[in-house]
């Protein structure tokens, strides 16, 4: 059985990064000792290391361990991990790197095997059949729009059905 938490965003109005998800993260990754963070979506162009450290800080506050990022052993980390978190940013960048590093099949296998998975924004987008519904700018040409296909539909994170007077960043 799949164990997934797919969130539209990592940050909601008036809160810190992942703050609204803390209790759910703690439950999802309970018992996990080697969580891998996939930083390839790079929000605001930050480095993979900076992004990993940002996630790592939050997870450490929950007594959870995110493995240190190194681009040279990402495939090995995916093999040994017992939890996966894919952060948000640009879905095209993320999917491009997953194809470039041949991680699609391994990631799909791990998630389908029941490894706990957290996706935020782009990390949620890639769980659908394709990235064809993303609102992200196509800033890089991807090999294919085909995503992981973990769920039998597409998700459009940050869907806007804004209600006047509500300050929740416009997400429905």
Predicted regions: what they are:
Residues 1-83:
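N-terminal beta1-alpha1 cap of cysteine-dependent amidohydrolase-like domains
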Residues 2, 37-40, 92, 110, ...:
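Aromatic-residue hotspot detector
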Residues 5-6, 83-87, 118-119, 155:
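Structural motif
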Residues 10, 41, 89-92, 122-123, ...:
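Short glycine-rich anion-binding loops that position phosphate/pyrophosphate groups of nucleotides
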Residues 36-39, 87-88, 156-158:
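Short beta-strands and strand-loop turn motifs
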Residues 53-54, 85-86, 134-138:
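Short, hinge-like loop/turn segments at secondary-structure boundaries
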Residues 64-116:
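Flexible gly/pro-rich beta->alpha loop and the following alpha-helix that scaffold active-site loops
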Residues 95-118, 123-172:
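Active-site-adjacent pocket-lining segments in enzyme domains
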């Amino acid at each position: 059985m799949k164990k997934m938490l797919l969130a539209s965003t990592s940050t909601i109005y008036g809160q810190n990064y992942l703050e609204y998800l803390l209790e759910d993260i703690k439950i999802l990754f309970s018992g996990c000792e080697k969580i891998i963070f996939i930083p390839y979506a790079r929000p605001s162009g930050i480095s993979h290391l900076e992004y990993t450290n940002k996630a790592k800080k939050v997870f450490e506050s929950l007594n959870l361990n995110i493995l240190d990022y190194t681009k040279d052993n990402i495939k090995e980390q995916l093999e040994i991990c017992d939890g996966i978190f894919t952060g948000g940013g640009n879905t095209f960048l993320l999917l491009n790197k997953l194809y470039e590093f041949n991680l699609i099949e391994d990631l799909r296998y791990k998630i389908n095997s029941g490894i706990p998975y957290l996706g935020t924004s782009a990390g949620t987008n890639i769980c659908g059949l394709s990235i064809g519904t993303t609102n992200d700018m196509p800033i890089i040409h991807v090999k294919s729009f085909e995503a992981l296909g973990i769920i039998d539909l597409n998700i459009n994170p940050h869907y806007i059905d804004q209600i006047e007077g509500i300050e929740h960043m416009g997400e429905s």
